[in-house]
Amino acid sequence: MAPPQGKPENVLRLADELIALDQHSSALQSLHETIVLKRSRNAQGFSLEPIMMRFIELCVHLRKGKIAKEGLYTYKNAVQNTSVTAIENVVKHFIELANKRVQEAQEKADKISVEYVDDLEATETPESIMMSLVSGDLSKSRTDRALVTPWLKFLWDAYRTVLDILRNNARLEVMYQLIANSAFQFCLKYQRKTEFRRLCELLRSHLGNASKFSNAPHSINLNDAETMQRHLDMRFSQLNVAVELELWQEAFRSIEDIHSLLTFSKRAPAAVMLGNYYRKLIKIFLVCDNYLLHAAAWNRYFTFTNVQKPATANFVILSALSIPIIDANKLSGPSIEAEDAKSKNARLALLLNLSKTPTRETLIKDAISRGVLSFCDQAIRDLYQILEVEFHPLSICKKLQPIIKRLAESNDTAQYIRPLQQVILTRLFQQLSQVYDSISLKYVMDLATFEEPYDFNPGQIEKFIMNGNKKGAFSIRLNHIENSISFSSDLFSNPIKSSDSVSLQSTPSELITSQLTRIAKSLSSVLMRFDTDFCLLRKQQAEAAYERAQAGVEQERKAVIAQRSLLELRRGQADTLATQREAELAAQRALKQKQESEAESLRVQEEINKRNAERIRREKEAIRINEAKKLAEELKAKGGLEVNAEDLEHLDADKLRAMQIEQVEKQNKSMNERLRVIGKRIDHLERAYRREAIPLWEEDAKQQAEHDREIFYEREKQRKEVQERKHEQAIKDKKAFAQFASYIHAYKQNIDDERDKAYQEAYAKAKNVIDAERERQRKEIFEQKLAEAIREAEEEAARAAEEEANRELHEQEEAQKRAIEERTRAAREAKEREQREMAEKLERQRRIQQERDEEISRKLAEKAAARRANIGASSPSPGAWRRGGASAGGVSRDSPRYSRGGYSRGSVPPRETLAPSKGAYVPPSRRNQQQQ
């Protein structure tokens, strides 16, 4: 079908007619050829928009994603300079239709699943499961795969197509952001993790291309505040969806994207934006159990925002105190794990805009120096004082117990209790190792006692010690026989240094290591005290060094100035070269873009020509196949020739006739052969064969049954022998184990007694605590009710005083309002009186003027009557000749009345001669003339 050459209305009408005839493919092809026509590129956006809407509907109906993509690209190139709104409407309609089809498919699949379940209360049995597998019944997963998955794939392709069309266009930024957010919600709603990863990669590639082709027409400008904010909002939405889908690697890459955008921007980001950025980092680091960078993120967040400062300060100090002293970075000796941890933390620190990885002591010192502790609650300040300033291993747990209870009241602070306990245990063992060589495990358990559910058992303590030994923080050995722990003191081992712990005294290894240093310091102090020559020599050396330094200052200053000048010169040259290189790159990009545009146009034209040629070929092939089908039907009706539908594509009329002749010959041969075989088989030979074989089959069946019986008896005998041997062995095992039964029962009884005793003690202790807590709550409630009654009485008195004051103020306002109304009424009456007097004065003047006008009109009327009387007396008779001449009463041509100033015969007299009738209106100009 040739592409329509008419108006858009005709194209739509033709498409509607084809749709009505259920020829959707033909309608789609017609609209597609109209859109890709060369003259359609110069059309207006509003004229092509209805065609594009119908084209998109057909593409969605037939699930033709590639054709929709090509049409949308062509439409965008045609109207992007004239009508951006049209592009937005079309792509929005495309996404809405695809979403609608997915929802319809989901509803249909759910309906099929519900209809398949006959009994909602019936349970699955093995028989029903096997029957469903054998019969091939559709399950929900199969239904979804058959109905929903194709439309999900189409919707995903639609999102990718639209994002690729809208990318890196400053006019389509808002729609690009909306479609990207919609794609994020699509991945979240249908749990499409793979598609979400691909979507993130697609957005990253778009952003990379935007920075490469920044000089292209309509390219986005990341230096613009609104554009940067849109991309940051998209990345934050991407981060939220990654967290919801539990794709932590993608969440980390999203954080890196946000950091890259913030770094790329030449403008300083807003404090609110940085606050949101650091809040997300805080959550991610907490989920990853990276307490060091979690505390660093809280520190940065406190620096860049002032909202909720007391609450933020609490978390800054609490997170810093929760950083483990035993860190992966402090593993003893070179280790791949340690190097990986260091490089990972260094890379993560860059996301916080930190030049190097922070440490626990630097974070705490920085927070204290900036006065963060003054904003914290009293419990947090007490925690810092006990843990960092007044740490005492014998009473630390008892002092911290109320603070831990306070932290456990909130879910946000309760998550820091376990890391705080790790810090307490580390400090405890480090200081115990400085005082004791060996200590009982029970004593350590008493020192590290916390209330449930935060208490430690011996297994947890042992695991903690082994972890500390592994990372080089401890040198502790466990003795399970004596139930004690011993601290190793190798005199020649490297002493463990930790800036996070308080040194109570020097260890033997530290004394051995620092012995030479201490001797050198002592000898130096002795020489300084008793050897005057040595002191004089030191003084001379210091003076000589000072003179050398002073002499080299000027030379160094000149060298610095020269180096600075050289750097400025090189920087200027580098800027010039960079500008030239940028201009060359821009020219190359413009040329490349022009070549790509021309190549794209050529490709589209070749594609159109190829498609037209293919369409013509298909039409010719369809005509040939239709003719072959008609001939095949005729041959089938006449000669019974059956032709396969696939073979019709390679057959013509001559081949079909030859096939008919060959078919007739085959039928004749087959008929003759069947007649010959039937004649030969009229005897009963086959029946005789079968009768003779019956006894043989019966004998074979008897032999087979006998053989099977022998095999069965043999296997049964073997099975009995095996069972007897197993039974004898089991009896022997029972006799052997019976010797230990008494020991086992005694051991079990001891354990039960210990557990019962511990339970009774814990029960009594808990009961005492509960009774004390109830008494305390009762007192608190009584005090609260008493304070509330006092407060209500005070509020009632204050309310009565306030009502009295309001009443007096209201009375004063009413008095002032009445005074103002009196003055206003008096002024209004005076004004009305003046207006009445003025109206009366004007009325008198009007009557006087009216009387004068009537008098003047009367006099003028009398004069006019007299003048008319005079004119009537001197006028000629009606029958007199009026031509000028010597006739009586006439006027000669030489008379003055016939001059220019007079009036001719048959003309009306001048206006001055016409007096108005009595009572007629006389204008003021006439009045003046009449008075003169």
Swiss-Prot record:
Biased amino acid composition, Low complexity: 877-893
Name of the protein: Eukaryotic translation initiation factor 3 subunit A
Residues carrying Phosphoserine: 374, 501, 874-875, 877
Main location: cytoplasm
Record text on subunit structure and interactions: Component of the eukaryotic translation initiation factor 3 (eIF-3) complex. The eIF-3 complex appears to include tif32/eif3a, SPAC25G10.08/eif3b, tif33/eif3c, SPBC4C3.07/eif3f, tif35/eif3g and sum1/eif3i. This set of common subunits may also associate exclusively with either moe1/eif3d and int6/eif3e, or with SPAC821.05/eif3h and SPAC1751.03/eif3m. The eIF-3 complex may also include SPAC3A12.13c/eif3j.
GO terms under biological process: formation of cytoplasmic translation initiation complex; translation reinitiation
Coiled coil regions, renumbered to chain: 537-862
Keyword set includes Cell wall biogenesis/degradation: no
Subcellular location: Cytoplasm
Biased composition range(s): Basic and acidic residues: 793-865
Alphabetically ordered keywords of this record: Coiled coil, Cytoplasm, Initiation factor, Phosphoprotein, Protein biosynthesis, RNA-binding
Positions of the PCI domain: 309-492
Cell inner membrane as UniProt keyword: no
Pfam families listed in its UniProt record: eIF3a_PCI_TPR-like (PF22591)
GO molecular function annotation: mRNA binding; translation initiation factor activity
Family to which the UniProt record says this protein belongs: Belongs to the eIF-3 subunit A family.
